């Protein structure tokens, strides 16, 4: 292996004189962003001791709502066995009032219907 130094000479020093511009960025001052003005001085206390201690109150309130795990809810499904689908059935009284009070009896018939599960036989009003 050859142990020669990679650079024979030292690189030239970086000296950018005023008035000399880098031609890659354009002439000096053209399109340059002016320097920001210095920030204003900070006000100092004369005594050096703070006159009061500010009180800081941190009040945090967070409402956490927990939802049950995702489950499939069947519309019209039986809440007892969770297998059957509820069917509507009319009561005897509802059918009787529908016949006796013919035009208005249908309101009674639909108001007095029951829901029944064909799987487990549970009835709901």
UniProtKB/Swiss-Prot annotation:
Q: Where in the cell is it found?
A: Lysosome membrane
Q: What induces it?
A: Up-regulated during TNF-mediated inflammation and immunity. Up-regulated by beta-catenin and TCF4.
GO CC annotation, single: plasma membrane
Record's InterPro entries?
BRI3 (IPR019317)
Question: Per UniProt, which keywords does this protein have?
Answer: Cytoplasm, Lysosome, Membrane, Nucleus, Transmembrane, Transmembrane helix
TM region positions: 67-86, 92-112
Q: Which Pfam families match?
A: BRI3 (PF10164)
For membrane topology, the record states:
Multi-pass membrane protein
Main location as per UniProt: membrane
**Lipid metabolism recorded as keyword:** no
The terms under GO molecular function for this entry are:
identical protein binding
Q: What does this protein do?
A: Participates in tumor necrosis factor-alpha (TNF)-induced cell death. May be a target of Wnt/beta-catenin signaling in the liver.
Family (UniProt): Belongs to the BRI3 family.
Q: What is the protein named? A: Membrane protein BRI3
User: Can you name the source organism?
Assistant: Homo sapiens
The upper taxonomy is: Eukaryota, Metazoa, Chordata, Craniata, Vertebrata
């Amino acid at each position: 292996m050859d142990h020669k130094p990679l650079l024979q000479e030292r690189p030239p020093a970086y000296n950018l004189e005023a008035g000399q511009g880098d031609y890659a960025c354009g002439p000096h001052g053209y399109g340059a962003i002016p320097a920001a003005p210095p920030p204003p001085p900070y006000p100092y206390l004369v005594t050096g001791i703070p006159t009061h201690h500010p009180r800081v109150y941190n009040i945090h309130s967070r409402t956490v709502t927990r939802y049950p795990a995702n489950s499939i809810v069947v519309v019209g499904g039986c809440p007892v066995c969770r297998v059957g689908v509820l069917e509507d059935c009319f009561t005897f009284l509802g059918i009787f009032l529908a016949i006796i009070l013919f035009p208005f009896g249908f309101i009674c018939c639909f108001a007095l219907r029951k829901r029944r599960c064909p799987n487990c036989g549970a009835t709901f009003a």
